[in-house]
Amino acid sequence: MLFVCVPLQGYLSSLDKRAFTYISLDGVVTGKADVKVSASPLLYSLLQSTMKEVKNPIGFGESGKSLYDQVSGVNFEKAVFEPMQMEDSAYPFLAFSGIPSLSFRFVSEKAYPYYGTSFDNKEYLGYATAQHLSSLATGAGLVAGQLALRLVHDHVLRLDVQYYKTVLRQWVVKINQRLKQVTRNGSAEGLSAKWLIKAIGSYSTAADDLNIELLNTDFTDTLACHNINDRMMRVEHNLLSQFVSPKEVPFRHLLFGHGSHTMAAMLEGEDREALRTQLALATWTLQGCANALSGDVWDIDNQI
């Protein structure tokens, strides 16, 4: 478990061999109204269960309510989770190193106005948090501590490989819509999301098989637990595209990276040949991820 980033910058390319999660507390308190989180989908379920166990640090007279209870709206994910940006200190660990990462913070409806000014100090941060700075910092520490304990307490890592199924399917819907737009005014032979969908199907099958295996695993069996943990940890790292150079395109993550190899790039381009190549490479990246999650590559039977 890692909480500091500066001493680790020289190890980013091999950090997935040294750590299994990165939790960032940079800028953890800049307001008091909302909780916002940027994270790998592997950590979504863990965060939700953790927030149900941590009391709201401010309370507003409602003693006993958890942070989860205080989230406004019915849709927890929509209210709390937001895309991870490049300026987030957790971003390179996710998009460059392929480590499940999470950034957690208390914010206000308006952005914190004092960054980079002489007013960026404890006094004005107190104003921004309505003098609840200590309580909010304590709450943030409790969330981070609970996350760490839940990750290391059990013999099997609490990474939810199922959650990526939903995320990947959402991307397929967007890409299919894009392909319809591109092919509307002419034929584009071979330009189809068929194989991409098959690769996502392979991932879904691998995730379901792992869940079944978890139900039948003796958690006192160290070797079995190690094997399962190793397969879960391969998911994030294998979503780093192997078809671009880390030197030229450092943020190689298929979903969270930047460059022509990403899912997002497929929604922007007009060149059909380039799009066909992007689809093929994305398919192979996802299939490789599915194969890694499945375990022994010699036991895998697929046609891609």
Give the predicted meaning of each segment:
Residues 1-304:
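Secretory-pathway/membrane protein signature
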